[in-house]
Amino acid sequence: SQQGTSENQVFIGVFRPAKERKPRWPGNLKQYKLGLIDGNVELVDANGDIAVNSQTGFIGACATSEWTTDTSQVAKSGGTTGPYFEGLGLDPNPVSECDADFLNGRSVLSDSPDGPFVEKGGAAQQIRGQHNSSSSTRNIFLATSSGTSLSLSDLTASDLPTVSSAVSSATYTTADVFDYVHGEDPGLAGGDPITLDSNASYIENDAILDSEIMPADGLRASIHGDIIHSRPLTLTYGAANGSTEFRVFYGSNDGLYRALDPTTGNEEWSMMSESHLSEIERQYANSPSVDYDGLEASFDSQMLATFEPKPYFFDGSTGV
């Protein structure tokens, strides 16, 4: 994972490869702090406890990152309430391993504690909740260039290329892909575009067109893409009114480059490059599958021909 620091604040980009070679990988940006524990400098969570499991080197099961809040009782379908991650069909299901005494009434499927789960808490939770009634307030820009000039404009559905699904029976549109970018469409289940029938013959896999499950309130659970090589940049700069602003800048492999308020975890704005527009449909469709080294031993040439390399977007470090 990549990280950026400012004073005692540590911002860590996280990701998890998707199962079944799917290209939509979940990610998040989480904040911890450096603190003194028994005279030693340690990475600590929002409660001031050591955040890292000393045996695994990963974030501990009961650590709670900054910005993360309890979502044990949120709006669900049918006018009921329940834990945010209940019934969303995520694989693996992010069930907390903390005991009942530690949870103190919180659900094991709440965002808090987020522990090592990528989707839980952090910036992802704040973006979901920041726009829980409508994504229309999100500032998503399109960056276009002409020579040495860079221009920013609001991203619109007409900016996206015409869809070209690998499955001929697909009926989704550029408007669906646009809603997915904003978080109001959950995207498709995805997978391999062809599959074997009972006669061992390849046919189109219509199951990849099944929709993911959309939460009853808020934006899609997969609102934040993976952060693999993008190191978060922390920057303090002068504002127009004479004060100073502190922001965190970083890219992720859902096609967006983000600016976050480190106090709240809120997304101030995000932008997409015109050079990345052609790959956004693949994020929505979650297909074709990713081509990894060594797959030749497990698949025949017809299936291998449908695989494509994993897409990378704003995947490097930011400089000033």
Regions from the language model: what does each represent?
Residues 1-320:
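A fold-level detector for beta-propeller and closely related beta-sheet-rich head/sensor domains
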